[in-house]
Amino acid sequence: MIEQARKLYKQAQADYPALKAQIEAQVVRWFWASGGMGLFSLEPFYFEQNHFSKAKILKKAPKNVDNKYQYGVNDKDEIIVVRNYLKLKGIIKGQYWEKFYFREENQIISYYFDHSAKKECANVKIFTYKDGLLQHIYAAFKEHYWEETMYYEGDKLIRRETKGVDNCSDPINDFLLYTYDTSGELNSITSGTGYVIYQKKGKKV
């Protein structure tokens, strides 16, 4: 599967016009959000792990799109397109990064394209599921790639292993551990070296 992700990445830029047309044809509604680092991620505990705040949904389209997010949803009310209007040096006003989510029964393929006119692909990721639970993430970038495997107790993610090759051709071999409080909410995320990445406020590992 990682080879499939790498293959899709290599042809992604050339496929961009067709991918964009195909996914946007499925959009039935658009909405906007502001602040934070977006509204959602397919990656488990993305906001907690990175200490990001979430964006807030806007009631109507903003007059100024700088640092705003635009979302396209399909007829199942699933997000399938994300546009991120970052205000950064070198980015022309109105340009945006964009993600496409091609959703299938037990798999989602995401494409992440940059803001440039060339629309270079930043990464391609394949998310696989079983009984509604994420099983693997296969990620391909320009010079590196990795595969992540999820382990559960019941429906609670307890371990996430990452193996691959970094952009210096060195091996990647790491894992994250997840703990939960008595109410079932995430309590902590710890790296393979024991470093506490996330700790719920008021709790101790």
Model-assigned labels for residue ranges:
Residues 1-205:
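Buried hydrophobic residues that stabilize the cores of well-folded domains
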